[in-house]
């Protein structure tokens, strides 16, 4: 359920963009009527309408995700708060300035913030971030936690670079597709590799899984 909620804003962004892209003139008229007060000049063009509408949806979806967790009395992860702040500020800039550049940079900034968190946690808090998150559920040797922590830092740093590369070398439509499915697919593959590595070094009753 949590994983679904995490990816829901991205999926809704993609769906909104694609629907609006297929009906650009109608989307522009709708955006001008309903978002005119939020954009510089008050008029939304057909070329920019899809990404502006998708941006509004992703802001609202992320806010709804936070409110849902709060109403259920569940903890809102720090990174979700960061994501909400980034999408609100950068998404707001995209809407006001009619510029897709800001929302395209948002995933990269978030990825780099997460990469920095994994790198700085051992220095600031004296423990690997992943170990702090999963240490109570999984027992691994210290060296394994360290490697996993560095792997996550490298993965997020690389994803940030990849997102910008796609954003500046391909169309907005291609970028939106990559954002929804490319990033998600790479995340699943990486998590699978992490799971296999964890299983290899996992301790069961004090014995490593690969030695049992």
Swiss-Prot record:
Its main location: membrane. It holds the Pfam family IspA. The keyword Cell membrane applies. It comes from the Bacteria. The chain crosses the membrane at residues 49-69, 78-98, 105-125, 150-170, 178-198. It is found in: Cell inner membrane. The keyword Cell membrane applies. One of its GO terms (cellular component) is plasma membrane. It is a multi-pass membrane protein. Keywords: Cell inner membrane, Cell membrane, Membrane, Transmembrane, Transmembrane helix. Plays a role in cell envelope biogenesis, maintenance of cell envelope integrity and membrane homeostasis. PANTHER family: INNER MEMBRANE-SPANNING PROTEIN YCIB, INTRACELLULAR SEPTATION PROTEIN A-RELATED. Belongs to the YciB family. This is Inner membrane-spanning protein YciB.
């Amino acid at each position: 359920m949590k994983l679904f909620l995490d990816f829901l804003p991205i999926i809704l962004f993609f769906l909104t963009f694609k629907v609006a892209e297929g009906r650009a003139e109608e989307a522009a008229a709708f955006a001008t009527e309903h978002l005119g007060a939020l954009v510089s000049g008050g008029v939304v063009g057909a070329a920019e309408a899809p990404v502006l509408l998708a941006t509004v949806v992703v802001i609202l979806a992320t806010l709804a995700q936070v409110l849902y967790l709060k109403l259920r009395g569940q903890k809102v992860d720090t990174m979700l708060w960061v994501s909400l702040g980034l999408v609100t500020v950068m998404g707001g800039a995209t809407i006001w300035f009619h510029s897709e550049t800001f929302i395209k940079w948002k995933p990269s900034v978030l990825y780099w913030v997460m990469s920095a968190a994994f790198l700085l946690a051992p220095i600031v808090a004296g423990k690997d971030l992943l170990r702090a998150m999963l240490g109570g559920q999984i027992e691994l040797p210290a060296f394994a936690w360290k490697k996993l922590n560095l792997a996550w830092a490298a993965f997020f740093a690389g994803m940030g670079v990849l997102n910008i590369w796609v954003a500046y070398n391909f169309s907005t439509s291609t970028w939106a597709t990559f954002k929804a499915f490319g990033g998600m697919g790479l995340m699943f593959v990486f998590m699978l590799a992490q799971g296999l590595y964890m299983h290899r070094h996992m301790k069961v009753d004090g014995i490593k899984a690969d030695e049992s």
